[in-house]
């Protein structure tokens, strides 16, 4: 199998010059080295044409609210993949733009407009792709349901985004979603209905067009085999067992929020889902290398809070000042809030797909001429 030359997808590490503080720069470099080693160990190497590394990642509130080192870590992870669906890109796309600067000129992205309304949460969704491996096939659009298929009388809270791509021999339509969340009875019912609606809608398209469709993103599925996952699979999509087994959240409770599901029609594409084809997948836990629990003290200067103290210039009045969190409070805030805001509360979920069908095609020709 041919592997891409490093020169084809090397990141722009000159971005490190943006970090002026010497200690912070040193920490970032050390953590990048650790992260790169972990990526080498856990994610397959990128190939020139044989495979496609497809992923989905909900990057929490993805805008310009992060430290430069965080953009470096996010870009490092993305650079090891070929095509990534990103959820929670905010209206101000400066965070995404910073990451694109680091990824370099061989990367491109396609993003939706902002979904309006309270449930839309001012979010976009986007696809990032390595143009060395993936081609945009000039079709893109947000999914709008027919009037007789509405969800409780309305469209999706956040419009799914469907784009046509090609990698190697594999031509496919890729749809990403960020399904509505909520714990009320009404919200739970709507979540299930949204999942069933998008799966059924795309399955009908796949069958009518005899085309291959993949749907991926944040479905807010609590666990494998529950009614939300069943809504996706009963709608006509298949989730390989090796993908189902990967929880994608951080925390004590195991959740399977993010998924990658397939509805394939080409005789060659179907091999992608062969459970015996050594297809690899995973959920990448970046906290093994960056923003680790033991690193919390390094970030105490940035984890401030507002407290009210007497105003020396105005007797009887108070004023707010910023103070550092310390001790147990700092540890808890770092674990539960700070590193989530800097990276995400989701792990990127990835799968390696075979996209070189040369052997199958040649074998088919041999059988035809042998008749």
Where are these regions (language model features)?
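Metal-dependent phosphoester-hydrolase catalytic domains
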Residues: 1-41, 93, 204-211, 221-371
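Metal-dependent phosphoester/phosphodiester hydrolase catalytic core
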Residues: 167-196, 200, 370
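Structured beta-strand-rich core segments of catalytic domains in phosphoester-bond hydrolases
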Residues: 83, 88-171
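Stable alpha-helical elements in mature extracytoplasmic
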Residues: 70-74, 92-95, 99, 124, ...
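Extracellular/periplasmic catalytic domains that process cell-envelope and extracellular macromolecules
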Residues: 46-50, 77-79, 102-104, 118-122, ...
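Active-site beta-strand/loop signature of hydrolases that rely on acidic residues for catalysis
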Residues: 54-59, 77-97, 128, 163, ...
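Active-site-proximal beta-strand elements of phosphoester/diester hydrolases
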Residues: 51-61, 138-142, 171-181
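Acidic/histidine-rich helix-loop elements
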Residues: 51, 59-68, 150, 183-190
